[in-house]
């Protein structure tokens, strides 16, 4: 029953937020925040008191804490949700940044507050569902349900209100990209289910059953490629990145926190959970191509980020660059790099979200996202420059932060398998220092281009920034706390993915 609360609470919180707006416009945000808090307490309850570590590898039953209810029995579809250490970590990230996103929007949303928080809660519910669904139809359901509320967030609460038509066009682009991703995934899931039916005469979407059924080599590569394309479009990886920068440029900052912090991380989760485990042979054959795409994203994202004049687009392209490293970790590394990937997902999500939050404060102060209009702000703005410098340095992997630990483990794990790949990846990481420090120099140093009054960081954003700083330092100094949670899951995923047939 506890597991079902992970999706029930956000859903009901969104519904209550929507209807409560009719009574008092401040009620929806309190309901949304309470819903996130209760969901987080539920995850903590599962983490402390339930046994999700037990693995029975001999029978391939790797999940001990799960809920299975009949749903569409005639097609073998169940409401099957479960957690392991990997899921627990991703749930903590989603809920932590979900609370941050709600707090960031606290006084920023001036219209349709009830509908806004409904969409935020549906995005978070869908993201949570992706991390706990172990029926492939249910996984697809949650994967797709995120699309609709994200469409409304960009089209109705865009950052630049004067250009409504362009925002709708950008929302349409996002819709098309993600819809293509969903259709490819659905076709691949159906082929996988058909393969199981041909061999066992049973229709099922159960992940555990599909996991132990070898896929015919004649179609394994095709199905794997379908899953891969669906995930890298959402990640996104070059050349399927066209929607991300436009989306972030026009999205509300709380929406950017959601999508960068949690939503994009559903893709590397899916690659590890599904591609690596369901299609070991095809994944092994495809690894060189995936690594090449990772390199392409790393270097392209870094170079384009360096040339950006819009602060939100710069941060978006930096995210693409980091996603390239994550893809290389998945396809070119080992168990060590997988553990590094977990830390990198957490740290990159936090540092990038923090940069978005601070850029929102700069926009509130200057009414522009154009870096060329900035300069010399260090003496005009209190706290923001120092915080921005910390998060920029964290993003490029300064020691003492979680980003450093994640990158170190990833590169160390890759080096054991492919030394040359690790060396090239290191060069790619160096480029992140160029665009990060260039951004800081252009915004906060040099001569001021305008006569700006003194500006103080909002007290709410100040404490949010402090919390995010402590989170990154915690991951940098005590990463073992997280690695212990995810170890059993990652160990199982790595060993199971090595069963080359």
UniProtKB/Swiss-Prot annotation:
Subcellular location: Cell membrane
Cellular component GO terms held in the UniProt record: plasma membrane
InterPro entries on file: NADH_Q_OxRdtase_chainM/4, NADH_UbQ_OxRdtase, ND/Mrp_TM
EC number, as in UniProt: 7.1.1.-
Catalysed reactions listed for this entry: a quinone + NADH + 5 H(+)(in) = a quinol + NAD(+) + 4 H(+)(out)
Pfam family, one: Proton_antipo_M
Keyword Repressor belongs to the record: no
Domain of life: Bacteria
Disulfide topology: none
Membrane-crossing residue ranges in chain numbering: 1-21, 30-50, 86-106, 115-134, 139-156, 174-194, 222-242, 252-272, 286-306, 314-331, 341-363, 374-394, 420-440, 459-479
GO MF annotation: an example: NADH dehydrogenase (ubiquinone) activity
GO terms classed as biological process: ATP synthesis coupled electron transport; electron transport coupled proton transport
UniProt KW keywords: Cell membrane, Membrane, NAD, Quinone, Translocase, Transmembrane, Transmembrane helix
Cytoplasm keyword on record: no
Mode of membrane association: Multi-pass membrane protein
UniProt family annotation: Belongs to the complex I subunit 4 family.
Purpose: NDH-1 shuttles electrons from NADH, via FMN and iron-sulfur (Fe-S) centers, to quinones in the respiratory chain. Couples the redox reaction to proton translocation (for every two electrons transferred, four hydrogen ions are translocated across the cytoplasmic membrane), and thus conserves the redox energy in a proton gradient.
Subunit structure comment from the entry: Composed of 13 different subunits. Subunits NuoA, H, J, K, L, M, N constitute the membrane sector of the complex.
Name by which UniProt lists this protein: NADH-quinone oxidoreductase subunit M
Organism encoding this protein: Buchnera aphidicola subsp. Schizaphis graminum (strain Sg)
Gene name, Swiss-Prot/TrEMBL: nuoM
């Amino acid at each position: 029953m506890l597991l079902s609360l992970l999706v029930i609470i956000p859903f009901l919180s969104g519904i209550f937020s929507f209807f409560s707006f009719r009574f008092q416009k401040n009620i929806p945000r309190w309901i949304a925040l309470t819903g996130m808090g209760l969901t987080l307490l539920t995850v903590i309850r599962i983490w402390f008191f339930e046994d999700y570590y037990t693995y029975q590898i001999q029978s391939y039953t790797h999940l001990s804490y799960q809920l299975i209810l009949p749903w569409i029995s005639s097609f073998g579809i169940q409401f099957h949700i479960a957690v392991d250490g990997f899921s627990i970590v991703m749930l903590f990230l989603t809920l932590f940044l979900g609370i941050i996103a709600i707090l960031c929007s606290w006084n920023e949303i001036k219209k349709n507050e009830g509908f806004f928080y409904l969409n935020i809660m549906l995005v978070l519910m869908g993201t949570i569902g992706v991390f706990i669904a172990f029926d492939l139809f249910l996984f697809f359901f949650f994967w797709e349900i995120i699309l609709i509320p994200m469409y409304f967030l960009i089209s109705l609460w865009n950052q630049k209100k004067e250009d409504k038509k362009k925002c709708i066009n950008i929302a349409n682009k996002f819709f098309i990209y993600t819809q293509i991703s969903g259709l490819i995934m659905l076709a691949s899931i159906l082929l996988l289910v058909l393969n199981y039916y041909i061999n066992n005469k049973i229709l099922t979407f159960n992940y555990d059953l599909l996991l132990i059924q070898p896929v015919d080599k004649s179609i394994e590569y095709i199905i794997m490629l379908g899953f891969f394309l669906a995930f890298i479009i959402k990640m996104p990886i070059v050349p399927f990145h066209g929607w991300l920068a436009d989306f972030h440029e026009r999205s509300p900052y709380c929406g950017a926190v959601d999508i960068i912090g949690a939503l994009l991380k559903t893709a590397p989760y899916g690659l590890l959970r599904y591609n690596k485990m369901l299609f070991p042979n095809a994944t092994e054959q495809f690894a060189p191509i995936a690594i090449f795409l990772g390199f392409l994203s790393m270097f392209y994202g870094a170079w384009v980020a360096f040339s950006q004049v819009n602060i939100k687009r710069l941060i978006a392209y930096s995210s693409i660059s980091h996603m390239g490293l994550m893809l290389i970790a998945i396809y070119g590394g080992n168990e060590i790099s997988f553990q590094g990937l977990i830390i990198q997902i957490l740290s990159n999500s936090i540092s990038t979200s923090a940069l978005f939050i601070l850029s929102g404060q700069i926009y509130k102060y200057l009414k522009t996202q154009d870096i060329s209009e900035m300069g010399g702000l260090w003496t005009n703005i209190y706290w923001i420059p120092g915080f921005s410098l910390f998060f920029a340095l964290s993003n490029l992997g300064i020691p003492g932060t979680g980003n450093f630990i994640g990158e170190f483990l990833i590169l160390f794990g890759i080096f054991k398998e492919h030394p040359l790949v690790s060396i090239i990846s290191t060069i790619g990481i160096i480029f992140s220092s160029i665009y990060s420090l260039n951004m800081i120099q252009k915004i906060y140093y040099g001569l001021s281009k305008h006569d700006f009054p003194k500006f103080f960081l909002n007290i709410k954003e100040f404490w949010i920034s402090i919390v995010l700083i402590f989170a990154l330092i915690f991951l940098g100094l005590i990463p073992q706390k997280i690695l212990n949670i995810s170890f059993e899951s990652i160990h199982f995923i790595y060993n199971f993915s090595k069963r080359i047939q």
